[in-house]
Each structure stands twice: as C-alpha cells, then as structure tokens.
C-alpha cells in the first residue's frame, strides 16, 4: 500500500485505478480504509476508488499535537494533487463525512458530487461526548476489555453483524497514544450546519434507521439544508456503518447515484421522480403488509342481495 508525505505526515492510501471518474472515500472514527471493501468489490468495471487512512488511523500516524477535520480536508487535497486528480466524487462515513463536507466547502471546484453515509453537519451531543469520554478513559487506563469492545462494536456495527470480531481485533492492536487526539478532534469539531447551502454539488445521503451514533433526523436535516441533496436513502434496520452491515443496499444506492451523474439534467429529474415514486409504493406495500389482510365488506353484501333476489323469485313462482 503506497504512502505519500503531505502536511507533515505520511498518508496511507489505496488507488484501484480505472477509467471512470474517481470515487474517494474517507472512513469513520476507529475504522480505516478497509471498511469500504464491500463497495469496491461490487463496483462495475472501470470504476476507480481511492481510499485512505486519516491521521491516527490505520497505517497513517499523526505527527502533530492537534488537528481538525479541516486539516484532514487539506490532507485529502494534497493526496489528490499527488495522484493528479482534479475532480472526484468525494464520500465518507461518519468522521469521513465530516471531512467530505469540509473539503466541499474549502475546495468546491474539486468536487463533482458527494456521498455521505452515517454522518451529520452539527456538533456532538453533550451526553454522547460524556459517554465516549468514559469509554476512552477505560480504554486508556485498562486497555480494551471484552465488554468495552462489544459496546463500541454495537455502536458502530450493531449487535448482530458477523464481521465485528475482525474490527475488534484491529482495535486491540491500536496504539493507545493515538486515541486521545482522534477523540478530541471528534468532540471539538465546529458546527457547519448553517454553511450547507454553500455546497452546490449533487449529493447522496445514506443513513441507517437504527444508527446509535447519529440520529437519522440529523442526517435528514443535513439533506434538507444542502443546496443539492438529490436523494436521501434510509437503510431499514441499518446501524452506523451500514455500508458494512447492509452492504448490498448501500452499494445499490451508490451505483444508481453514480449512474445518474452521467445523465442530463432532465433525465436526472425523471430518475429522481421515479425513485420517489418507487419509494412511496414500497412504503405503501409495507403498511398494507403490517396492517394484515383487509376485511371483505363488499362481496358479502353482494352475496346477500343475490340470495334475497333468489328467494323473491322462488316465492313469485
């Protein structure tokens, strides 16, 4: 895996190559570039994916005392410069979404579209900051015990996903010295909700309905405030990292969005209308299924009328 020196540290990245416009994906807190393996595996031929490890994650180590998500946006810009990529689809999950939004604000000319998964534009809720702080204190003081590991996995990956053990094993290997700064960057980030209208790039927002880290309402508000949020996809039962736990649904949403970027404006409008129509029909079917079979009221009435007419005819004879 190649490394590139940018802004004072070595950035670890992976470039699949391909003839199509690059799709650049940034991972979430405590994760790394490998979390997007399902999306890369499902991509059509020629699709180019660039994934990278942010500071304090994966094989990229932080060499500064402090950094912000704006700094990570600068890291991404330096990486794209190194690769000769002028414009790309910029995406991210959770923390990666924080970076993608700031990159779009700072370098709008480099963004052809955005893919935002399990993320938001606001700051962290105080009660969640306190919870994360307590978990961090235990991790730093005692190491990652099984109970804490399972709690973190439940927040990020849900309780039932079979791949959790792979990530727990990675967390056990993570140097404790990198935890504090990554956490500080998370909880001290600035609120950019009011600036979302400045982002003009077409955007896809994907969010799990069971996300324990970021409430889906925050993602819906983000989509509403973005200037060009073309589609909001709610992954039923999906948690925080639904691109891993519900990969097929997320892959389909991303593939359809990328295909739509190649269409003309009227074609894209028609595609959005068809998507909305299909979603309404799906929800209507789900409501019918949940309510059970409808009562048959018309047929029995018709049957009684027929029986009455038959009786009257017999009496007349």
Predicted features along the sequence, with ranges:
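Gly/Ala-rich beta-loop-alpha elbow adjacent to hydrolase catalytic centers
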Residues: 92, 96, 100
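Catalytic histidine neighborhood in serine/cysteine hydrolases
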Residues: 216, 220-241
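Flexible "cap/lid" loop of the alpha/beta hydrolase fold
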Residues: 101-106, 111-142
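Conserved acidic catalytic loop of the alpha/beta-hydrolase fold
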Residues: 70-88
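Conserved alpha/beta-hydrolase catalytic His-Asp/Glu region
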Residues: 124-130, 144-197
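Short beta-strand/loop motif that positions the catalytic acidic residue
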Residues: 199, 205-207, 211
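Catalytic histidine-centered segment of alpha/beta-hydrolase-like enzymes
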Residues: 238-251
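Conserved HGGG/HGGXW glycine-rich cap/lid loop of the alpha/beta-hydrolase fold
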Residues: 9-65
